[in-house]
Amino acid sequence: MKTAEKTKWDILYDPQKKSLFARLEEFVINVYFSDVFTKAILSVSNIKNGKIFEPGSGSGMTCGKFAEKGFDVTCMDLSENALQKTKSVFKHMDLDGKFTLGDLFHTPIKDEQFNVVFNQGVMEHFRLANLDPSKGVKEMLRVLKNNGTLVILVPAYFSPLFFVYQFFKVFNLLEKYWPYTNQDFLHKHELFEMMEKAGCKNIVVKRLWSSFFFSMIGYCKKE
């Protein structure tokens, strides 16, 4: 990953530089959406125990929910600040986890290690940065065990968040208030094609109603 991209995420997770909107977003994710995403992933994977990996774990709250349920959790992020945030979350919740500094496109993990590999709020940032997100999905598949479940959650096109983003964009307020200036909102067919290009089979893509349709979920089993 480009050094500029790494620096951008380190700034985002620097508590001294975090914008008001970024703080609000993190609060909402921590309070509500991490629980929604955890339930959705458990539902589509039908997993009761095992190893879970989140490349692009951010603040680590969703991984924390899985650790609370007894799963063996590995969190990976490009940003050292994000990993420090995750470690503090796990320490505060008295949870065990593994933490890896790494790039989704060159994951420093051996093949076929996990029962579930997921991320949320990650794959929408690559196309506008001239990166092919399917290469990241391919890496996620590589570290997933056979018959394991791959899950990707992204902001949906024409979701409530999409219209808020467009408002900020029209009035040139993204740089000042929005945490991500290169955020993408995906159509169903775009997420499907991203996963298909990476080699996924029997893909399911749908809007996640429990997120108030803010998010879209794509998932498949590794065959």
Predicted regions and their residues:
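Core SAM-dependent methyltransferase catalytic element
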Residues: 198-200, 207-223
